[in-house]
Every structure is written in C-alpha cells, then in structure tokens.
Amino acid sequence: STVMTAVSNCFMQKRLIRYVTDEIHAGQDVLQFGTADGGLQHAVAEKMNGSGVYHIEDISKPQIDALLPSISPWLNVRLNVRDFSNPTDRKYDAAVLFFTLHELPDARKEIVLKRAFDALTSHGKIIAVDYAMPCAYHPIKHPLRLFNRLFEPFAESLWYKDIKSFAPANLRESKNIIWAKSTTFGGLYQCVIAQKR
C-alpha cells in the first residue's frame, strides 16, 4: 500500500533490504515471490554479482514489465509471470518473501509458504520480511490498525499469528528446520528465517 510503503521507504528500507542481502551469497540460486518496491531487486542482484540465478516471479505482467529496466544490467536475473501457488521443479538456495504475505489471505499465505519450502534445496532457507504488531506505545499502531482494516485486510493477521504458523504443520516443529525471528522499528517489521539443515 502507498502509505505503508512510504513509511518503510522513509525510515527503514535499507535495513529491511539488508535482512535479505545478509542471507544471500554470490553463486546461490534465489527465488523471489513478487516484485518489491524500492531497491530490493537491485541490492540482491548486486550481492549475487552476476553469479547464480535470481528468479523473480509475480502474478502481474505489468509489475514484471516495470521491473525490467532496473535489473537489465544483470544477466543472471530471470523474470516470470506466475501464480505463486504453481509448483516448479527447480530448487533454490533461498526463497524471498519481501512484503508478500500481508497481501494474501491466510489460506494463500499457507499455500505460498508450502510452495516456498518445496522449492528449497536440502540446505535452503526462506527469508520473509513483512509487517508485525507494533509495540503498545508505538505512535502509529492505532492509525495503522484502522488503515489495515480499510485497505489491507489481510495484513492484520500478521499481528496476531507468527509467520511460522502459516507453514505446513510438519515443518513448524521439524528438528530439520531452524526458525529465527527478529523485529525492528518498535515491532512494526519482522524478519523470519527458516533454514533447512
């Protein structure tokens, strides 16, 4: 959304992007669910430095087309118009969900997280950056709640449910997956890493 994106752009964008780029290395294959505002794609492509494959999917062809100029210098970037729930045979070292889940109904959140896990290599990871519940004293908590209810009806569930809770049940408690969560900006944003081992 315009207002929420403006908040992140003004105050936190570089830090939020760094959550992703800190987890990615040159030579890896990366799958990104949805195009993102701002400099995410540029930062990821730069970090990968032309090696590995950076695959970006979005259900919207106009969004994909709009992204072309910003990623054109990197030949390892692949763009695809695709429904997130459609499986792929290719396996990736990292799956990125950057402000994707809050746009989806809870049932779709579950489908997309399952697809993300299914797309990982045996030691791959999911990197999910999205909104979370701001702390009680956060100055924009109550205006944001009203805004969400009017314009982002699927965002508020991330206030009350962990991203982990949308993963398939067998993966939530699996000893073969390490879950880590951190928050920033008074709890407004979260980063969840799910690392296979």
What are these regions (language model features)?
Residues 94-107:
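A short SAM/SAH-binding and catalytic strip from SAM-dependent methyltransferases
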Residues 192-197:
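C-terminal lobe and adjacent flexible extensions of AdoMet/dcAdoMet transferase-like proteins
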Residues 85-95:
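A short acidic, Gly/Pro-enriched loop at the edge of an enzyme's catalytic core
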Residues 110-122:
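A short glycine-rich, Lys/Arg-flanked "PGG" loop and its adjoining helix->strand segment in the class I
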Residues 50-51, 120-125:
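Short glycine-dipeptide loop
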Residues 9-27, 39, 43:
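Conserved alpha-helix/loop element of class I SAM-dependent methyltransferases that forms part
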Residues 31-85:
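Class I SAM-dependent methyltransferase SAM/SAH-binding core
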Residues 129-174, 179-188:
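C-terminal alpha-helical "lid/dimerization" subdomain adjacent to the S-adenosyl-L-methionine
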